[in-house]
């Protein structure tokens, strides 16, 4: 791509989060979801205004819904659907139907990374004219293991070009 074509490059941001715990036997499902938007600042601003208006600053947990949380969820969905650049998709794993031993040698970090890569690739599409940034909820990853660099490397190697420029995990309670 020529330098004068830089305005054609899309710079979407992916917000990745999970629900459920892979290694918890009594938790039958594990899900990864991603919101992709080319205008993250607008969506974040709407959510911040909503949180300030309702004085609600805690993390939303689906298993702890209350009347106030229903209202913030409703208005949050409204803000999301008004953002024409925002897209949501997810992958839901029914853990008892998957053979983690055969496919992943029971390496649950590999399971998480593999499904993260799959979800991101499905949302990148052909990768043409896109350079993405991924922000993920802080998922336990032991020292010496690097989810961010591994995921970015796998995706960029797949496309044979830079499609993911950055991947950062943050604690969702701090943002």
Walk through the language-model features, giving the residues of each.
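Phosphate-ester processing/binding pockets and catalytic centers
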Residues: 1-175
């Amino acid at each position: 791509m020529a330098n004068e074509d830089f305005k054609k490059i899309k710079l979407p941001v992916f917000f990745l989060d999970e629900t459920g715990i892979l290694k918890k036997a009594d938790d039958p499902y594990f899900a990864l979801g991603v919101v992709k938007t080319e205008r993250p600042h607008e969506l974040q601003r709407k959510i911040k205004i909503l949180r300030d208006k309702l004085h609600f600053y805690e993390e939303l947990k689906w298993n702890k819904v209350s009347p106030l949380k229903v209202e913030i969820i409703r208005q949050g969905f409204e803000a999301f659907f008004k953002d024409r650049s925002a897209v949501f998709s997810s992958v839901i794993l029914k853990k008892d139907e998957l053979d983690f031993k055969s496919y992943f040698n029971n390496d649950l970090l590999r399971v998480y990374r593999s499904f993260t890569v799959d979800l991101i690739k499905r949302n990148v599409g052909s990768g043409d004219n896109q350079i993405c940034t991924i922000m993920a909820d802080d998922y336990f990853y032991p020292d010496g293991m690097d989810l961010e660099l591994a995921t970015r490397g796998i995706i960029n190697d797949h496309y044979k070009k830079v499609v993911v420029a950055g991947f950062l995990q943050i604690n969702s309670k701090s943002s």
